[in-house]
Amino acid sequence: MQNTIPVSEVSRIRFFRSLIAIWLLMGASLFVQRAAAQTTPAGSTLPSETPARLQPVIDSFDYERRDVMIPMRDGVKLHTVIILPKGAKGAPILLTRTPYDATAQTSHAPSAHLAPILQGYDNATEVIVEGGYIRVVQDVRGKYGSEGDYVMNRPLHGPLNPTPVDHATDTYDTIDWLVKNIPESNGKVGILGISYDGFTPLMALVNPHPALKVAVPMNPMVDGWMGDDWFHNGAFREQNMGYIYEQEGTRDNKIKWWTSHFDDYDVYMEAGSAGELGKRHGLEQVGFWRKLLEHPSYDAWWQQQAMDKILADQPLKVPVLLVHSLWDQEDIYGAMAVYKAIKPKDTGNDKVFLVMGPWHHGQEIDDGSSLGVVKFDSDTGLYFRREILRPFLDQYLKDGAPKADVAPVMAFETGTNNWRRLGSWPSGCPPTSTSSNCTIRATPLYLNAGLKLSFESPKSGDAPFDEYVSDPAKPVPYRVRPIQPMGYDTGMTWSEWLVDDQREQSGRGDVLVYESETLRTPVKISGQPMANLVASTSGTDSDWVVKVIDVYPDEVAGQPGMGGYQLMISADIFRGRYRESLETPKALEAGKPLLYRFALPNANHVFLPGHRMMVQIQSAWFPLYDRNPQTFVPNIFWAKPEDYRKAVQRVYHAPDRASFVELPVVMAK
């Protein structure tokens, strides 16, 4: 049977066909309209809402910012940020020269007010804002916005730098430009800074510009081999490798050091030697790293750029305020070495000043009421900035300012938590109108049999030595693991490690621990302790770490967490191969007792009654310092896995082989 469609259905189909035709026509029309729109001239597009160049309205700001490029004598231009208080007139200039980004250091907050934009590294904000100073921060050549080539701690013109420019000439040229081009200034300039930025004020003292009236080097880099950033007595500070990589890898520090482990202890152990780790990171592309590999010993390359040695040969023309942190985890050597070098030139006792505070590296610019768990009963950082730094700067930089009431040495005394006004350093107590009422006596604190510590020398018949096994496969960590990398990011505690509780180390079998009886009277030390260690090793090279420690009572009222705390007061490391000469390493004679005598960092401390004194001896401080293979090799940077061997270490304490730490004990006259 054939299918048929009713008439009504035919009508319905015709209707829908007509409707579809209408839709198709409408669609075609829309398509034509869109196509026409796409061929519309560009001038009719929706315009950008971003201005070609935004002009911020800053009438309400209480400061003016100027970014300039200052020409140096060789034609290179250095990026410089100038911050002026609004309405400034006849104002002095505070200059900082930095490799750490001048823009960032003057842009800490998006604020209309001067204090927030400066709150941070290098900026003593209270001094700058309350004192009405013009703040100038400059990128050193080769970094961030500045032209030229970057060289780490660029040496002075001479054997190590054949060019006509250095930090001394760049500072001179910068100051010359500033006083001629900032009409709001009074023509007087002070220079200050921390760490690397503390090194540049020292350079400014070489042939200083006449307008430079005062310098404040804080925690400065001075001698990278003896005891600042790169080595301590020949032991390489390998945790600094990341800094070198980032600082010299690019102009703006954008390429970051990478790691494959959470614990830095594992990072450096897995690689083996520092040289091998550097190779794995491509660090040999970096010029400063290649120089370190070539100069592991204290040769002319190091000696000729040591700032204490350089300044010892320079005339003293500019007043200097050296700032030292007693627990400086980076540059604990520098400020004190410069003070010792230039103070003899200060015949009037009015040009070289010293501040010693209870701080980590650069903490004087921050809250100084505590360091880690150690409390100081007041904000020592604020005291420094308001009572010492500001009046000191005002005296030399402000027209008509009064003389600052600042003693030649302002030293915080840890233990008692008091500031001491001293005539010089070391000095046990303030001078009277006629003479000092105390003296400092080098007093041996002896290691004795039975792991005892005493001011009494060893006795005949007692055990002549103690020993331990030092295993490079299990080096003593310098702090409790997991060990963080160096740095100051939120959550990082790198700045606190020198005040870490040493109980973790004192419980190890490869650390010798000598402890005194409980003190009945206070023992005050002011100056540099000297390690006098008679020791032997079964190997042919060895590191020796000596730590002077204040042991708190078992219970501390009000601070239960400090019960039994072992607080380092002074500590350092010495690489045995340099026992006879810092310039020429020599293998040690295995098994032979030898004398190792080396200085520890300055201390100004009182061991209180109820406390005990402690000395710890060990042969590794890893991974802050690279491992000694304990087998003599020409260059430890390239020690092979088979070079790292266990060694039996002996520390002697017989009458004819006495080991002791010589303490600068303050005695009443």
Go through each PLM region and give its residues.
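C-terminal, loop-rich substrate-recognition/catalytic regions characterized by aromatic stacking residues
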Residues: 41, 51-52, 259, 269-272, ...
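N-terminal cap/lid segment of alpha/beta-hydrolase-fold proteins
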Residues: 50-88, 515-521, 584, 588
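Cap/lid segment of the alpha/beta-hydrolase catalytic domain
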Residues: 86-181, 229, 365-376, 506-508, ...
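Accessory cap/linker subdomain of secreted extracellular hydrolases
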Residues: 103, 110-114, 118-124, 130, ...
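Active-site-adjacent alpha-helix of alpha/beta-hydrolase-fold enzymes
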Residues: 120, 333-352
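Alpha/beta-hydrolase fold nucleophile elbow
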Residues: 183-195
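Glycine-rich nucleophile elbow surrounding the catalytic serine of serine-hydrolase chemistry
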Residues: 193-203
